[in-house]
Amino acid sequence: LQNAETGDKKCQLAVDMECYKLRKILGSYAAALGHVDAIVFTAGVGENAGEIRQRVLEGLDCLGIEIDKAKNLGTRSKHGETLISTPASKIKVFMIPTNEELVFVEDVVGILNKTYDDHMVYQYTFLKK
C-alpha cells in the first residue's frame, strides 16, 4: 500500500485489481443471497486501511450501503469493533479486529490439556469479556 501511495504503477494496479475483485465478490454474494445483513472488514488491511475499505465499497451504493467516511477513515484495529456505516445504510458495515495468534495458542493449550473438543464451543478467553 505504501508503494502504491508513493506512485509505484504496478502497486497501484495491484491495489486497483484487489479492490475490484473484492467488490465483484461482494456483489456476487449479495445477488446469490438476496439479502445481506452486514459486511465485515477484518485482518491487517481490513482493520487498518480505511481507504481500501472505501474503495472496495465504491459502486456498491446500489445495495444501499452508506459509509460514514470520517469514521471509516479514522478507524483502526486499536479502536475495537466499529460500525463504519451510517444509520441510513441498508447494510451494516463493520471493522472487527482479529487475533489469530491468540486463537492458535489457545487451541494448542486446549489440545494439550485435553479440554479442546470443538472450536465452535471452545471457551476462548476473548469470549469471556
PLM regions and their residue ranges:
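Adenine-nucleotide phosphate-binding core of ATP-dependent small-molecule kinases
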Residues: 1-32
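Active-site proximal loops enriched in glycine and acidic residues that flank catalytic Cys/His/Asp
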Residues: 4, 15, 40-45, 71, ...
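Short, glycine-/Ser/Thr-/acidic-enriched flexible segments
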Residues: 7, 46-47, 100, 110
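Flexible, glycine/charged-enriched surface loops at secondary-structure junctions
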Residues: 12, 29-37, 66-74
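Glycine-rich phosphate-binding loops at beta-strand->alpha-helix junctions
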Residues: 37-59
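Conserved phosphate-binding/catalytic loops in two-lobed NTP-binding clefts
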Residues: 54-100
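Structural signal for terminal/edge beta-strands and the immediately following C-terminal loop/tail
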Residues: 80-129
